[in-house]
C-alpha cells in the first residue's frame, strides 16, 4: 500500500547529539529567553521615544500587555543594567548602550520580517512572528537570511516600523 507524505508516522529520534552539544543548544535558548524581555522593552522604549517623544511606564505596560507593577520592576532592572535612565515626571530614556541594543533589535526584526514576507507569509503574521524569532536566531543565521534576500533579488524593504 502506497502512503503519501502526510500519512507517514512521526519519525522517532534514533540518535541524540553529544551531551555537551545538546546542553549548549538548550543553554543558548535559555539565554535568549532571558534577554528577550529586555530586548522587547528597549525596542518599545525606543519606538515610543521616536514617535511620541516620551516612554511612560503606563504606556509601556499597556503596549506590552503587562501590569504597571511589572513594567516598573522591569524598567528598574533595565536601569540597573545600564540600558535605561529615568527622570522624575519625564518617563524612561535609553542610555547609549540601550539605544544601540534597540537599533540592533530593530535591524534583526526587519530582516526576519523581510524573509518571512519573501516566503509569502502575510505581513501582519510576519510582524507578529518576528517578535519571537528575532530573539532566537544567531548572527550566522541572520547573515544567511540577508544573503538569501540579496541573492534572490528580493532585497530588504525600507524600514516600516
Put a short name on every predicted segment:
Residues 90-109:
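Basic, amphipathic "hinge/linker" alpha-helix immediately C-terminal to the N-terminal HTH DNA-binding motif
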Residues 24-66:
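N-terminal helix-turn-helix DNA-binding core of bacterial DNA-binding proteins
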Amino acid at each position: 500500500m502506497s502512503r503519501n507524505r502526510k500519512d507517514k508516522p512521526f519519525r522517532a529520534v534514533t540518535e541524540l547529539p553529544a551531551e555537551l552539544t545538546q546542553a549548549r543548544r538548550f543553554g543558548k535558548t535559555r539565554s535568549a529567553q532571558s534577554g528577550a524581555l529586555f530586548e522587547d522593552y528597549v525596542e518599545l522604549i525606543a519606538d515610543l521615544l521616536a514617535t511620541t517623544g516620551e516612554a511612560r511606564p503606563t504606556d509601556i505596560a499597556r503596549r506590552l500587555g503587562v501590569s504597571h507593577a511589572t513594567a516598573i520592576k522591569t524598567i528598574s532592572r533595565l536601569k540597573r543594567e545600564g540600558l535605561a535612565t529615568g527622570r522624575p515626571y519625564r518617563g524612561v530614556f535609553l542610555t547609549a548602550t540601550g539605544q544601540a541594543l534597540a537599533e540592533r533589535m530593530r535591524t534583526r526584526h526587519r530582516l526576519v520580517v523581510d524573509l518571512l514576507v519573501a516566503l509569502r507569509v502575510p505581513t501582519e503574521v510576519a510582524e507578529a512572528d518576528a517578535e519571537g524569532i528575532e530573539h532566537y536566531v544567531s548572527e550566522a543565521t541572520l547573515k544567511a537570511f540577508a544573503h538569501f534576500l540579496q541573492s534572490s533579488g528580493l532585497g530588504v524593504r525600507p524600514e516600516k516600523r
